[in-house]
Amino acid sequence: MAKNKGVRIVITLECNECRSNPAKRSPGVSRYTTEKNRRNTTERLEIKKFCPHCNKSTPHKEIK
């Protein structure tokens, strides 16, 4: 028999300021990968993490 699909899924977090701000330290968009529990966190995740392109801590939002 096949195993049940897990509750944890892999998501990608992308910097909000990199997409909207063209005048930044270096070109590119900061992305992090992490896991989230589908049962506990049903809405999209937003975490403040360090962005090497902006050179500061910025909010990172979950993308598909």
Swiss-Prot record:
Entry superkingdom: Bacteria
Gene Ontology biological-process annotations: translation
CC per GO annotation: cytoplasm; ribonucleoprotein complex; ribosome
One Pfam family it belongs to: Ribosomal_L33
Ribosomal protein in keyword set: yes
Cross-referenced InterPro entries: Ribosomal_bL33, Ribosomal_bL33_CS, Ribosomal_bL33_sf, Ribosomal_zn-bd
GO molecular function: structural constituent of ribosome
Keyword entries, A-Z: Ribonucleoprotein, Ribosomal protein
Keyword Ribosomal protein included in the entry's annotation: yes
Assigned protein family: Belongs to the bacterial ribosomal protein bL33 family.
Protein name: Large ribosomal subunit protein bL33
Organism from which the protein derives: Prochlorococcus marinus (strain MIT 9313)
